């Protein structure tokens, strides 16, 4: 079973990115002063970069989790420790 934290982290990052883009899509730039527009687009860029980095980190953690699971399950059954498997949430 995939750890819930990875799924939750990915969903939160994607929600932040999508909600930011949806909010910016409805802004009329003609009614706002130029500095405010640049500041707003700067914040949008920052949020999107942070969301992208969060998704990449969650993906790397998922790959690491899969590799640990494969390495653990390759061991001979007599060397498998149930407490380690519970700790890593492998079985």
UniProtKB/Swiss-Prot annotation:
Q: Membrane-spanning regions, if any?
A: 5-25, 35-60
Family annotation (InterPro entries):
Adeno_E3B (IPR005041)
- Is Transmembrane helix there in the keyword field? yes
Residues cleaved off as propeptide: 1-22
Q: Which GO terms describe its cellular component?
A: host cell endoplasmic reticulum; host cell membrane; membrane
Residues the record marks as site: Cleavage? 22-23
Chain ranges on the Cytoplasmic side, renumbered to this chain: 1-4, 61-91
Q: Which family does it belong to?
A: Belongs to the adenoviridae E3-RID-alpha family.
**Name by which UniProt lists this protein:** Pre-early 3 receptor internalization and degradation alpha protein
Please report the organism this UniProt entry assigns to the protein.
Answer: Human adenovirus C serotype 2 (HAdV-2)
